[in-house]
């Protein structure tokens, strides 16, 4: 079988459309529920097929014209061809199905999906990949399914306007650098304070010369307020000029809900969507159910994104994070916002939990905000610690479901899970889930 017709029934985690062909599941990227498409079967496995669209015979009513000229080629977005309400509906269904499949979480425990009010122009961070071909600069993102760099359009539709201005300026000045092939990537980030910070990845043998070049072009980078050079791992980052950190706001619990201002330095983590981060923090605060005197442990705490809003309401908080500079940021953020009764420790989440338990510490609530790989090592330690509540923030439903399964076996039950659309135009799903000890 090389060509076939297939009706797309739904969307799957990973972004592809799902249908059935001769009894087999078939996944076809860039299709929409209701599409009738002619496909070429590209992958034929014993249990599933993967197809490539040759022709759309009957378009879905959910289908729209994607606004980006490189959509479908660029690996950044998967759903620009869908109306936003259809994207949100698909994400809610995928989230519900995934939690049931991996964690046996009932549908009634999943709250309505929190849609974004800014489905475009929301990304405050971007990693621009760079290659040179025939003396011409190509700067953008990886082609879907490869490490081949394609040019981003003049305006990436999901990036903050400040990021797009920076891309424009960099394209004008980078051709003057004497070692163009020694810069494979430039990270750009913007804060709600209006600053734009760059981290230039340099793989040459003369970082001093590279730093001198980026100092010399400062007048030509009107959109940029700080540059750093990274010559290896994150601990190699060196300051070149300008600002060292960016800031954004989150809701607080003290002083009638006064917002908190949090900063993070180059190399530190922040959510890519500041508006939806505030939605996420608000939901976490509600689910945590903490107040004055309650003991809270925040694992993977970063710069205090959840820790400090919780502590602003009087909770006694310990934050754990293995990236030392983020711990420094969290301490500075606590001081800046006048928040006491907090302790931040630079240590791995699982090791930190073990040490705190061995020291006789106990906690009413534990917050987890792990990376995409989940918290496999930490959740077992948290279960032994036996807090009354666990609030689990996740950016990957399958690893969330896996870890919820571990906690269920340890005597916890899921009482509420909230999906949040942090990443419109993609299949990625952020969420926050509350578990209570039975």
UniProtKB/Swiss-Prot annotation:
Q: What class of enzyme is it?
A: transferase
Pinpoint the TRAM domain residues.
Answer: 1-55
List the coiled-coil residues.
Answer: none
InterPro entries attached to this UniProt entry: MeTrfase_TrmA_AS (IPR030390), MeTrfase_TrmA_CS (IPR030391), NA-bd_OB-fold (IPR012340), SAM-dependent_MTases_sf (IPR029063), TRAM_dom (IPR002792), U5_MeTrfase_fam (IPR010280)
Q: Where does S-adenosyl-L-methionine bind?
A: 271, 300, 321, 369
UniProt binding sites for [4Fe-4S] cluster: 68, 74, 77, 156
Name the keywords, alphabetized: 4Fe-4S, Iron, Iron-sulfur, Metal-binding, Methyltransferase, S-adenosyl-L-methionine, Transferase
Q: Which residues form the active site?
A: 395 (nucleophile)
E.C. number(s) listed in UniProt: 2.1.1.-
Q: Which GO terms describe its molecular function?
A: 4 iron, 4 sulfur cluster binding; metal ion binding; rRNA (uridine-C5-)-methyltransferase activity
Give an example GO biological process: rRNA base methylation
Family according to the record: Belongs to the class I-like SAM-binding methyltransferase superfamily. RNA M5U methyltransferase family.
* Alphabetical list of NCBIfam families matching this protein: rumA (TIGR00479)
Protein name, as recorded? Uncharacterized RNA methyltransferase GSU1748
What species was this sequence derived from? Geobacter sulfurreducens (strain ATCC 51573 / DSM 12127 / PCA)
């Amino acid at each position: 079988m090389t060509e076939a017709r297939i009706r797309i029934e739904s969307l799957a985690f990973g972004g592809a459309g799902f249908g059935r062909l001769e009894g087999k599941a078939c996944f076809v990227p860039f299709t929409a529920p209701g599409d009738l498409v002619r496909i070429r079967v590209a992958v034929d496995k014993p249990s599933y097929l993967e197809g490539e669209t040759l022709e759309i015979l009957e378009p879905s009513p959910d289908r729209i014209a994607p606004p980006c000229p490189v959509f479908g080629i660029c690996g950044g977005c998967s759903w620009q061809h869908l109306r936003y309400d259809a994207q949100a509906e698909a994400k809610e269904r995928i989230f519900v199905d995934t939690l049931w499949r991996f964690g046996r979480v009932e549908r009634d425990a999943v709250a309505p999906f929190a849609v974004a009010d800014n489905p475009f122009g929301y990304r405050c961070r971007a990693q621009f990949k760079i290659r040179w071909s025939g003396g011409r600069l190509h700067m953008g993102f990886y082609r879907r399914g490869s490490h081949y760099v394609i040019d981003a359009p003049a305006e990436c539709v999901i990036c903050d306007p400040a990021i797009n201005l920076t891309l424009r300026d960099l394209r004008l000045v980078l051709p003057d650098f004497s070692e163009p092939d020694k810069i494979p990537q430039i990270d750009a980030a913007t804060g709600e304070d209006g600053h734009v910070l760059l981290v230039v990845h340099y793989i040459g043998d003369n970082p001093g010369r590279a730093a001198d070049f980026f100092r010399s072009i400062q007048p030509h980078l009107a959109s940029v307020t700080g540059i750093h050079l990274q010559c290896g791992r994150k601990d190699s980052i060196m300051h070149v000029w300008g600002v060292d950190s960016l800031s954004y706001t989150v809701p607080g619990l003290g002083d009638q809900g006064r917002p908190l201002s949090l900063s993070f330095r180059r190399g530190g983590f922040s959510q890519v969507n500041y508006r939806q981060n505030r939605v996420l923090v608000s939901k976490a605060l509600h689910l945590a159910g903490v107040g004055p005197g309650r003991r809270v442990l925040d694992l993977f705490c970063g710069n205090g994104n959840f820790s400090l809003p919780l502590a602003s309401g009087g909770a006694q908080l310990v934050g754990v994070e293995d990236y030392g500079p983020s711990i420094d940021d969290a301490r500075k953020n606590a001081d800046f916002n006048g928040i006491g009764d907090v302790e931040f420790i630079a240590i791995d989440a699982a090791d930190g939990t073990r040490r705190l338990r061995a020291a006789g510490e106990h906690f009413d609530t534990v917050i987890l905000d792990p990376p995409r790989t989940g918290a496999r090592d930490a959740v077992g330690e948290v279960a032994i610690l036996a807090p009354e509540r666990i609030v689990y923030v996740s950016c990957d439903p399958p690893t969330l479901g896996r870890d919820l399964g571990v906690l269920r076996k340890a005597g916890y039950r899921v009482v509420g899970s909230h999906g949040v659309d942090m990443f419109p135009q993609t299949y990625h799903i952020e969420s926050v889930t509350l578990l209570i000890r039975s």
